[in-house]
A protein has these predicted regions:
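DPxDG-like acidic metal-binding loop motif
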Residues: 1-22, 37
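An extended, acidic
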Residues: 29-153
Length: 153
């Protein structure tokens, strides 16, 4: 079970594995957008500024390839906004408690969830908190390619 509440808009996002995702009791699903250049992508920035380095090339690459970037300020809400189709994708490095509930909601809404860097063999990918990527199924591979290219540049 995953639950995320948005008190500003009185929105309750919830999901149970295998039973779908819901917003205030109504079923939700990711957007049907197929082109990254027409997509809204969300991300966040680290509080520890010494880790900001890789974010800049990624941000630059994503901005060049999508419609726009959003920074809402809550990873859980960013991910839920992907689940309900308000955004097409989200990427960031987080702590697992920041994304666990929202990740289930996004998966149940039809999103693809993974990472844009390699997950160490000794860590379960669903709990790996570095370089998280969540997007609708059409946008996921496009955004993955952009982020991986930015990291290689």
């Amino acid at each position: 079970v995953g639950v995320v509440y948005n008190p500003f808009n009185d929105e309750l996002f919830c999901a149970e594995r295998g039973k779908g995702a819901f917003l205030n009791g109504d079923a939700i699903s990711v957007s049907a957008e197929t082109e990254l250049r027409r997509s809204l992508i969300a991300t966040g920035f680290p509080y520890i500024k010494s880790t900001l380095g890789p974010m800049i090339p990624r941000l630059h690459a994503v901005l060049r390839n999508c419609a726009d970037i959003r920074r809402i300020g809550s990873a859980a809400l960013d991910i839920c906004f992907v689940a309900v189709g308000r955004l097409e994708g989200y990427y960031e490095s987080l702590n697992v408690w920041d994304f666990a509930a929202a990740r289930l909601i996004a998966l149940e809404a039809g999103a693809e969830c993974g990472h844009f860097s390699e997950v160490p063999d000794d860590i379960d990918p669903q709990f790996y908190d570095n370089d998280l990527l969540i997007a609708n199924p059409s946008i996921y591979p496009q955004l993955l390619a952009v982020l991986q290219a930015a990291d290689k540049a």
